[in-house]
A protein has these predicted regions:
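Conserved phosphate-binding elements of NTP-dependent enzyme cores
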Residues: 1-201
Length: 201
């Protein structure tokens, strides 16, 4: 939802013959608003058990079995997949699945370009590391980027928790921003990253 790709996915599901026949609108495929989502878990697919003297435990929702939506919504399929199946896909898998749908695939490619292809579409932003959250915001900018006046980007240790290969992907994305007229200021301790900087303070 952060890149607004989910709006286009919901429209694709609502345009299927099964959805039209059942008069299911795009709103029913949203896990953020009432309608088609499971109201017991409010579209999260999980419920929290309070353990009082221990840490709370998250378990699959009893009502929907962790599938987030009501049964009649889950009956609708797009290319043999339910809406929950799509939420369970990684960004990489979804990019292939929606390759011929430019409105969706272009936004997913922005996520892949910043090295977030391993995230699932239904993953909560609260589970992301600080570095992942920063790269998600960067992908959001890339999806909406307009040519012209440059912007200043500030990053606070964006390599936290990243594999060396992912760090090189991130460096490539930041180099791309600079080459298009933007400025990038980074607080960082990773020596490979620092070695790539134009200026070190």
């Amino acid at each position: 939802t952060y890149l607004k790709a989910w709006d286009d996915v919901r429209k694709l599901f609502a345009a299927t013959p099964a959805a039209r026949k059942a008069k299911i609108t795009p709103g029913a495929f949203s896990f953020n608003t009432p309608g088609g989502r499971c109201e017991h878990c409010q579209g999260t697919g999980i419920t929290t058990l309070e353990m009082h003297f221990m840490a709370d435990i998250e378990v699959p929702c009893d009502e929907c079995g962790g599938r987030r939506f009501k049964a009649h919504v889950l009956e609708v399929r797009y290319r043999e997949r339910t809406i929950n199946d799509v939420l369970a896909m990684t960004v990489d898998e979804a990019a292939k699945f929606f390759a011929d749908r430019a409105a969706v695939s272009s936004k997913l490619e922005c996520l892949r370009s910043v090295g977030l292809g391993y995230l699932t579409l239904g993953q909560s932003t609260s589970t992301l590391s600080g570095g992942e959250a920063q790269r998600l915001k960067l992908a959001g900018f890339l999806a909406e980027e307009k040519r012209g006046r440059g912007s200043l980007f500030l990053f606070d240790e964006p390599t936290t928790g990243l594999h060396l290969q992912d760090i090189h992907v991130l460096i490539g994305v930041l180099d791309g921003l600079v080459s298009r007229g933007h400025s990038v200021l980074v607080v960082e301790h990773h020596t490979d990253f620092i070695a790539h900087a134009d200026w070190v303070i």
